[in-house]
């Protein structure tokens, strides 16, 4: 498999975690979202992915998959063990609910394209920072109430909710949103920091991570 990715992309980070948790080998193909206006906007990449976003996963059969939820769902169905979702329908729905909260209601509101549009509309950096802090804080406060009070988000092993939450926490801290108000979330962040799959997928450990 080949993963078109960017080291700091939250959506790419999710897919890297899922691949690592399942122990799947893949070739990382970095797509620089900054250099020369963004490689994702260049004809060569648009020919692969007309949406011009990362991640995109080329599977062994040659098909190119886009959008992290669809990619992760494919990985879960194609490589069911170790499972990212519970076998219990109710718990599985709760896991998907937290993943959707992060992926649909938090992340899109601080996506680079949204922040750049705010700047184009005349908002200064302090206003952009307040925008990020409002939406990230509101979303994570809800997540704090929805996840379990011990272990990972839902139990003693990482699953789909953690795959979504941990990259969001990286983004939150990068934008200056402290996690101190949310002890359950802080606990998950600490577990992830010590877990080999999450360390492997971390933005600091990617082929395109800039040198310090």
Curated annotation (Swiss-Prot):
Keywords, sorted A to Z: Isomerase, Phenylalanine catabolism, Tyrosine catabolism
Tagged with keyword Isomerase: yes
InterPro entries named in the record: Glutathione-S-Trfase_C-like, Glutathione-S-Trfase_C_sf, Glutathione_S-Trfase, Glutathione_S-Trfase_N, GST_Zeta, GST_Zeta_C, GST_Zeta_N, Thioredoxin-like_sf
Pathway: Amino-acid degradation; L-phenylalanine degradation; acetoacetate and fumarate from L-phenylalanine: step 5/6
Residue stretches making up the GST N-terminal domain: 1-83
CDD domains, per database record: GST_C_Zeta, GST_N_Zeta
EC number(s) per entry: 5.2.1.2
Catalytic activity from the UniProt record: 4-maleylacetoacetate = 4-fumarylacetoacetate
Record-level GO cellular component terms: cytoplasm
An MF annotation (GO) of this entry: glutathione transferase activity
Disulfide bonds: none
Gene3D superfamilies xrefs: 1.20.1050.10, Glutaredoxin
Enzyme class name: isomerase
Cross-referenced Pfam families: GST_C_2 (PF13410), GST_N_3 (PF13417)
Domain called GST C-terminal: residue spans: 88-211
Source domain of life: Bacteria
GO terms, biological process: glutathione metabolic process; L-phenylalanine catabolic process; tyrosine catabolic process
Similarity field: Belongs to the GST superfamily. Zeta family.
Protein name: Maleylacetoacetate isomerase
């Amino acid at each position: 498999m080949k993963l078109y990715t960017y080291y700091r992309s939250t959506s790419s980070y999710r897919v890297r975690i899922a691949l690592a948790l399942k122990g799947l080998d893949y070739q990382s193909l970095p797509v620089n979202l900054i250099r020369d206006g963004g490689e994702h906007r260049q004809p060569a990449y648009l020919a692969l992915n007309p949406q011009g976003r990362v991640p995109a996963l080329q599977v062994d059969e040659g098909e190119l998959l886009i959008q992290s939820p669809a990619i992760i769902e494919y990985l879960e169905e194609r490589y069911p063990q170790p499972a990212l979702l519970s076998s219990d329908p109710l718990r599985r729905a709760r896991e998907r609910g937290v993943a959707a909260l992060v992926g649909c209601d938090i992340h899109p509101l601080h996506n680079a394209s949204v922040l750049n549009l705010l700047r184009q509309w005349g908002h200064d950096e302090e206003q952009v920072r307040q925008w990020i802090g409002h939406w990230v804080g509101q979303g994570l406060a809800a997540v704090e109430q929805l996840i379990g009070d011990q272990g990972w988000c839902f139990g003693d092993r990482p699953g789909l909710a953690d795959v979504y939450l941990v990259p969001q926490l990286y983004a939150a801290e990068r934008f200056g949103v402290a996690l101190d108000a949310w002890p359950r979330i802080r606990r998950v962040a600490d577990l992830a920091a010590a877990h080999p799959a999450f360390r492997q997928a971390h933005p600091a450990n990617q082929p395109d991570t800039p040198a310090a």
